[in-house]
A protein has these predicted regions:
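Bacterial N-terminal signal peptides that target proteins for export
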Residues: 1-6
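Bacterial N-terminal signal peptides
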Residues: 7-15
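Feature marking well-ordered beta-strand scaffolds used for ligand recognition
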Residues: 21-793
Length: 793
């Protein structure tokens, strides 16, 4: 049986070459056959996809027995996005193989191990066809869909067995399909009958075409479309289909609601001659709302499992039915749940064989995905275990430093004047499945000189020793508090050998305080899991923590969810006694922030020594406040003062910035101006601070890239920008109003430099050794070195 599911089809359309996603996506496709379960994990950009094979050990537990990888796999090939199996033959799609033309790999079972035996391609293939979207196999035929062909019109290809080989037989393409229909999304095959869906046809109503094989003409002849009443735009009729014993089921997850997210329904047809006639309609029992019932279907002729992945507020459910062939009646048997919580989307895809069923929750493990195995007794399905894949990614790069070549490449990463010293993938830093990096900071041990990287992650802070930068060593981790939840955002800063950690959208997280001297003497042979040394509970969640090391004050910004939020503005904390933080007051500039509460997304607080003599020696905070630059004098914590507010053209989201070392300029990024279309290229705002009361936008520096900017830092006359998909950008700001690009290192070696928010989150350029550490969310930690080239080089 199958399977590729609705989300995979949508993902394929959104991820043609040039616009990739990066999620792990365990369970893109599944198939169950006897006591074996096959699970695809296709959505890798930094490596080829994989397919896992699971079976039972002697105790009855489900374990991984094989991991299948293609012999000619390449990063981002989507290997595993479609599966089909018949007896000892297994088909695995790789829709983006060969520059998007796509291919289907053929495997044979040899003594319990699946061995690659061939590869199917089409004779008229072209880039971006995405061969392998729909997939079906019988003893004599293999049918393969290619939804992206001809501007997503789509097509299907028939391959017929000839001896031990599969030979391309014909191309199947109805005369009335249009651009964007995605014909070939799903294929169901039984004997000489075949159904092929185009779920985006007719503006999303969806179509399902019927074909019959004629031995006389040796062709698959179109025999009409399946009729379904009440379809509307984005019903997506044909999202999933199944055939068994002359009965077919067709899912329409947008039915009773539309927009692809209705209550959903499954249409049941019976075969009369060569015509499929509508017999009944299945709708979910004991559930209402936009649950997308029919997004996935499994049917063996006597029972059906139907996924509704949006049921229960996104937890997901699978509905079980039994079928009486004599009366053509259906009986609701049970509703199957997993033990996942939150928006796990259980039921995104489902399959079963005999008394073994598998349902995928592709939102589990923070989007990495998981699958649940169920066993049936007397029509009741009970959980038999949870299965997941491995933590995969790029290989670690350690040892000798890799110079950026004259061609602008270092170990496969585009670069200029930035050398790759080393790289640690997520799995080498204690990350579990679905965990990604975010912010980064550093600490140098004043006694030993050790340089330690503080790596923010979804649920923890990892410690990596880069004293020997070519051989980075993972020392351990500080998990989030037990009262918190995992979150995209984590931020860390250091004061007097103590680390302070906050997290946004993390519930009752508060601020963790950790004594970094506890890392002394560790060599990584036994990575430690630490507990905080102190915990500050006057805030719950916060977007960033700002520290002025000269004064011993910290500033929680973007606070929310409980405690004293200060409207998201500056929540001031005295940390002069590092383990005993004390609330010191609030500052809010009510003319800033989207809700006009003074919300600050990030800030920098310093003892000012710039050109404005009125404020020299004062403690000044410069806030990136969503809508504007905010400048505050917080010298007197009991009476903080607004100094200035300055807006600028084409605001998207004032995000983060950093002062020049002489405090004459403030360089600021706007996170949403690129993705929102406010500007065409990556923009950096340059503020002239000669008069703090009247900051002047001196220049908008436009890079040649289109990536979204994120965090930037300045050391001397050099600015280090982390700009998501374009990676680390190094600029010479000797002439502050005319920055010059002097180096770069792309941490995301795929998918161009569009404005999507994946890639380099942040960097830390302040180690005395001269290395710069860079986090890239789904890749890991890069240790690089900016090395200006001479003319002779």
């Amino acid at each position: 049986m199958k399977r590729i599911y609705l989300a995979s089809i949508v993902a394929l359309l959104a991820s043609m070459p040039g616009t990739p996603g990066a999620s792990q996506a365990f369970g893109n496709a599944i198939t169950v056959d006897g006591d074996q379960v096959f699970v695809g994990e296709a959505s890798y950009e930094m490596r080829s996809g994989v397919v896992y094979v699971f079976g039972r050990d002697p105790s009855g537990s489900w374990i991984q027995t094989q991991r299948i990888e293609p012999s000619s796999g390449v990063p981002g090939d989507r290997f595993g996005i479609g599966l089909a199996k018949h007896e000892n033959t297994l088909l695995i799609s790789a829709t983006r193989a060969d520059e998007g033309a796509g291919a289907v790999y053929v495997y044979q079972n040899q003594n319990g191990t699946w061995i690659e035996s061939g590869r199917l391609e089409t004779t008229d293939r072209s880039p971006a066809d995405s061969l392998g979207t729909g997939l079906a196999i019988t003893n004599d035929w293999i049918m393969v869909g290619t939804i992206a062909q001809n501007d997503r019109t789509g097509a299907a290809y028939a391959f017929r067995r000839e001896g031990e080989s599969w030979v391309q037989h014909s191309t199947i393409r109805p005369a009335d399909i249009d651009e964007g229909d995605t014909f070939g999304s799903r294929i169901a095959l039984q004997g000489n009958q075949m159904l092929i869906s185009a779920p985006f046809g007719s503006d999303g109503e969806g179509r399902v075409y019927s074909f019959t094989y004629s031995e006389d003409s040796d062709t698959w002849e179109e025999s009409g479309q399946l009729q379904a009443p009440g379809l509307s735009e984005e019903t997506m009729f044909g999202t999933d289909i199944a055939i068994e014993n002359n009965v077919s089921l067709v899912g329409a997850p947008g039915y009773f609601g539309g927009t692809g997210a209705g209550t959903g329904a499954v249409f049941v047809y019976g075969l009369a001659g060569d015509t499929w006639q509508l017999a009944s309609l299945l709708s979910p029992y004991e559930s209402t709302g936009a649950i997308q019932f029919g997004g996935s279907i499994a049917f063996d002729g006597n029972a059906a499992l139907i996924g509704a992945f949006s049921a229960a507020q996104g937890q997901g459910r699978i509905f079980s039915y039994t079928f009486n062939r004599e009366t053509f009646e259906w009986t609701a048997a049970s509703k199957i749940s997993s033990a996942e919580t939150g928006r796990a989307f259980f039921g995104r895809t489902v399959d079963f064989s005999g008394d073994i069923a598998v349902g995928v929750a592709n939102g589990a493990d923070r989007g990495a995905g998981a699958a649940w195995v169920f066993e049936r007794t007397d029509n009741n399905w009970t959980s038999a275990g949870r299965i997941t894949g491995d933590v995969l990614g790029m290989d670690a790069i350690t040892g000798d430093e890799v110079s950026c070549s004259t061609e602008g490449e270092a170990s496969g990463f585009d670069c200029e004047s930035v050398d790759l010293v080393s790289f640690l993938p997520l799995a080498h830093m204690g990350a579990e499945r679905g965990i990604v990096t975010n912010d980064v900071w550093g600490w140098t041990d004043p006694e030993t000189g050790q340089e330690i990287v503080l790596v923010g992650m979804t649920n923890q802070t990892a410690f990596v020793d880069v004293t020997d930068p070519g051989m980075p060593t993972y020392l351990g981790r500080l998990p989030m508090p037990e009262t918190a939840n995992a979150s995209t955002w984590r931020d860390m800063k250091v004061y007097q050998d103590h680390m302070y950690v906050v997290s946004d959208g993390a519930g009752e997280h508060g601020m963790q305080v950790f004594d970094l001297t506890r890392l002394r003497g560790l060599n990584g042979s036994d990575p430690q899991t630490f507990a905080s040394d102190a915990h500050y509970d006057q805030i719950a969640s916060a977007h960033n923590i700002v520290i002025n090391e000269e004064t011993g004050f910290a500033y929680s910004v973007g606070s929310s969810g409980g405690g004293q939020t200060c409207g998201g503005g500056l929540h001031m904390i005295n940390i002069q006694d590092p383990l005993a933080p004390v609330f010191a007051g609030c500052f809010q500039d009510m003319s800033t922030g989207r809700q006009r509460t003074g919300y600050s997304h990030d800030a920098q607080c310093v003892v000012y020594h710039g050109p404005d003599t009125d404020y020299q020696g004062h403690e000044i905070c410069l806030g990136s406040n969503e809508t504007a630059l905010s400048i505050a004098d917080v010298t007197d914590k009991s009476n903080p003062l607004t100094v200035a507010m300055a807006s600028y053209p084409n605001v998207g989201y004032s995000h983060q910035g950093w002062l020049s070392e002489d405090h004459s300029y403030f360089f600021m990024g706007d996170e949403l101006d690129e993705s929102g279309g406010n500007v065409t290229n990556t923009r950096t705002l340059i503020w002239d601070l000669a008069d703090l009361d009247d900051p002047i936008l001196a220049r908008e520096y436009m890079a040649e890239t289109k990536a979204t900017d994120h965090n930037l830092y300045i050391l001397g006359n050099t600015m280090y920008q982390s700009n998501y998909k374009s990676g680390l950008r190094v600029l010479d700001i000797s002439d502050p109003e005319n920055p010059q690009l002097v180096g770069n290192f792309d941490t995301v070696p795929y998918g161009g430099d569009d404005a999507s928010m994946t890639g380099s989150w942040s960097n830390y350029p302040y180690f005395k050794s001269g290395v710069v550490v860079v986090t890239s969310s789904r890749e890991g930690l890069f240790v690089v070195r900016y090395r200006p080239r001479t003319i002779s080089e």
